[in-house]
Amino acid sequence: MKILITGNNGYIGTVLTEILYNQGFDVVGLDNNYFEQCNLTKVNNLSNQIIKDIRDVSIKDVKNIDGIIHLASLSNDPLGELVPKVTEDINYKSTIKLASLAKKTGVKRFVNVSSQSMYGISNTDKELDEEQSEKNPLTTYAATKWKSEIELNQMSDDNFVVTSFRPSTVFGVSPRLRCDIVF
């Protein structure tokens, strides 16, 4: 199975790429290597690596791909507020562009990494429920993640299955450090 991982040289992507590669998947990476100077150890050395900004993704990049794991984004609230238009372009518009190209070329599965930030500040002590809890994105980052999920869900069908998951702030050891958060 041929898997495209966007953001494969990022904090989560470096670990995920190695796991999938070691399990025998044919992994294609797409990353702009923006945080290249934040390497703790050697990062992936894929023979099938695309160095490109996610905003420039093309139909050629998704051709003959079976599934996509979409990690590429500006990955937190403070970074997303520096230039909100860029956050919108990367986190929302590029996500929808990638998914549209993928669907057009016959990609079967699209895994979207979203964020729990879309819930904002809770006004209740009730346990969080993905479907029932109110969405209250307070930042550009959170709003772009929520908008992307809404549109991706509309694109999903029997031939193009979209799954989104919403991690909270991720931490731990990775070959690519997160230089954008306080430890």
Regions found by a protein language model. Name each.
Residues 82-85, 89, 93-97, 118, ...:
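Catalytic helix-loop patch of NAD(P)-dependent Rossmann-fold dehydrogenases
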Residues 105-109, 160:
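A short helix->loop->beta-strand "cap" motif at the edges of active sites that frequently abuts
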Residues 15-19, 101, 151:
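Rossmann-fold NAD(P)-dependent oxidoreductase module
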Residues 115:
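Residue(s) in the substrate-gating loop at a strand-loop-helix junction
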Residues 54-90, 101:
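NAD(P)H-binding glycine-rich loop region in Rossmannoid oxidoreductase-like domains
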Residues 1-67:
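N-terminal Rossmann/SDR dinucleotide-binding element
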Residues 36-37, 75-76, 119-120, 172:
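Short beta->alpha connector loops of Rossmann-like oxidoreductase domains
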